[in-house]
C-alpha cells in the first residue's frame, strides 16, 4: 500500500462547528485532528448557535482562513447542503435516522455528489436499497477516549439525585424517545427505590429549561402514578470535560431513541464505562448487541406523517422524515424498557459485564483517531482519482 503523506492533502470541511450538535462536534474533532496531522483544512463554517467556549471558537475561525489550492475537495458534513457546488470533488458526509427507506429529495441530492460518506453500514444499506448512484464509503465517527474515560471525575448533582442514577443525554424532541423513557421509569420505580433518572437535554429551538421541565411533568402526569422515583433535569450547556464528569456521576446510560445516525452520546457513555440501554434499530444496532448492551426491540414500524399532531410524532421535525419508516414503541415497549432498567439496577454484575465488552470495543476501535485515519485514506483516494482525470 502506498504511504499517504497528509501534508500533500487539502480539504474544505463544510458544516456547523460552533454548537453542541452532533455534526458540529464531528466537524470540530475532524478538522482539528486532520490539521494536526498536516492536512490543509479550511473550515467552511455554516450558521449555527455559538455554544462552544471562546478558545474553541477562535480555533475554528482560524481554520476558516486556511488557504487551499484550486480543485480542493469539499466535504459537506451535515444533513444536506442547500447548494452543492465546487471546482473540485464534492463529497457528502451525512447520515439519516430512519429505519427503512430514504426521502426521494434526499436521494436526488446524493446523486449530485462525487462520493457519499456515511458513518455506519445501516446508512450505506439504506442508500444501496434506494438506488443512489454515487459511490458510497464508510467513514466512521468516534470518541475522544482521553476526555471520555472512567477517570474523568464526577459532576455534583442536586440533592434530589439518588445513589443509583440512570442518565439520558440528548436534544429534546420526539425522535429521542424521552416520552417512552420517562413513562418506563415512572411506571417501574417507586419512591422507596434508591434510584433517579437524570435527563441532560436542551431544546433545539432555544426554548428555556422550564419548557423541558413542563414537558417532563406532562409526561409524568399522563401515567397517573403518584408513588414514583425522582427525575432530575440538567439543561445547562457543558463542555466535553463536564459532560464526561456527568457520565461518571451516573450508573447506567439510557437512550430510548426512535432513530439515530450514529449516537455520539452512546459511545461517549460507553467510553466512560457505563452500561448502555438502547433501542434495537438504526445506526446504534451496528455496534450494539445483546452481549454488550440492553436492547429494546421495536413493536413494528410505521410511516412518519408530518400531519400527525402527536407530541411523539417525528414526521414534522425534519423534511426528510416525511413518510419514512420509524420504529413503533407503545405500551408494551414502555413495560419492557422498565424491565430492562430494573435488570440493570438489580443485577449489577451482569450490567458491568456488558459494559466492559462495549467499553473495550469503543475505546479501541471507535475513536476519533481511527475516524481521522479513515477520513485521510478516503481523501487521498479522492485526490488521486482527481489527479488521474487531469492527466
Segments predicted by a language model, with ranges:
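A short, well-ordered alpha-helix in the C-terminal region of glycosyltransferases
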Residues: 336, 342-343, 350-364
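Aromatic "clamp/platform" in nucleotide-sugar-dependent glycosyltransferases that forms part
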Residues: 258
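Extended catalytic core of nucleotide-activated donor transferases of GT-like folds
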Residues: 2, 12, 49-130, 242
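Conserved donor-binding/catalytic core segment of Leloir-type glycosyltransferases
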Residues: 12, 158-176, 182-185, 197-199, ...
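Short hydrophobic beta-strand element within catalytic cores of glycosyltransferases
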Residues: 266, 275-278, 288, 294-295
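Acidic anion/phosphate-binding donor-loop and adjacent secondary structure
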Residues: 104-105, 143-161
Amino acid at each position: 500500500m502506498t504511504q499517504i503523506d497528509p501534508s500533500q492533502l487539502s480539504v474544505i470541511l463544510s458544516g456547523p462547528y460552533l454548537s453542541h450538535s452532533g455534526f458540529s462536534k464531528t466537524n470540530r474533532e475532524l478538522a482539528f485532528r486532520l490539521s494536526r496531522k498536516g492536512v490543509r483544512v479550511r473550515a467552511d463554517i455554516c450558521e449555527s448557535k455559538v455554544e462552544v467556549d471562546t478558545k474553541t471558537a477562535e480555533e475554528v475561525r482560524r481554520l476558516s482562513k486556511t488557504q487551499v489550492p484550486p480543485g480542493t475537495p469539499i466535504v459537506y458534513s451535515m444533513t444536506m447542503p442547500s447548494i452543492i457546488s465546487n471546482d473540485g470533488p464534492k463529497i457528502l458526509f451525512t447520515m439519516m435516522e430512519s429505519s427503512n427507506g430514504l426521502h426521494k429529495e434526499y436521494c436526488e441530492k446524493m446523486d449530485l455528489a462525487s462520493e457519499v460518506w456515511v458513518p455506519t453500514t445501516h446508512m450505506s444499506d439504506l442508500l444501496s436499497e434506494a438506488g443512489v448512484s454515487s459511490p458510497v464509503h464508510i467513514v466512521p465517527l468516534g470518541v475522544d477516549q482521553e476526555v471520555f474515560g472512567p477517570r474523568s471525575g464526577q459532576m455534583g448533582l442536586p440533592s434530589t439525585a439518588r445513589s443509583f442514577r440512570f442518565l439520558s443525554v440528548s436534544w429534546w424532541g420526539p425522535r429521542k424517545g424521552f416520552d417512552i423513557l420517562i413513562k418506563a421509569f415512572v411506571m417501574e420505580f417507586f419512591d422507596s427505590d434508591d434510584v433517579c433518572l437524570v435527563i441532560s437535554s436542551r431544546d433545539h429551538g432555544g426554548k428555556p429549561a422550564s419548557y423541558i421541565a413542563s414537558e417532563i411533568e406532562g409526561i409524568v402526569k399522563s401515567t397517573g402514578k403518584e408513588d414514583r422515583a425522582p427525575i432530575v433535569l440538567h439543561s445547562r450547556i457543558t463542555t466535553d470535560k463536564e459532560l464526561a464528569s456527568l457520565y461518571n456521576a451516573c450508573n447506567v446510560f439510557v437512550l430510548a431513541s426512535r432513530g439515530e445516525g450514529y449516537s455520539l452520546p452512546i459511545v461517549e457513555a460507553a467510553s466512560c464505562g457505563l452500561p448502555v440501554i438502547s433501542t434495537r434499530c438504526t445506526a446504534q444496532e451496528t455496534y450494539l448487541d445483546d452481549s454488550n448492551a440492553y436492547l429494546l426491540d421495536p413493536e413494528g414500524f410505521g410511516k412518519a406523517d408530518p400531519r400527525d399532531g402527536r407530541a411523539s410524532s417525528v414526521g414534522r421535525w425534519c423534511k426528510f422524515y416525511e413518510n419514512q419508516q420509524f420504529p413503533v414503541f407503545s405500551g408494551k415497549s414502555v413495560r419492557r424498557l422498565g424491565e430492562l432498567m430494573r435488570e440493570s439496577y438489580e443485577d449489577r454484575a451482569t450490567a458491568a459485564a456488558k459494559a466492559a465488552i462495549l467499553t473495550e470495543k469503543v475505546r479501541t476501535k471507535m475513536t476519533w483517531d481511527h475516524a481521522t485515519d479513515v477520513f485521510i485514506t478516503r481523501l487521498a483516494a479522492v485526490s488521486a482519482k482527481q489527479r488521474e482525470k487531469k492527466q
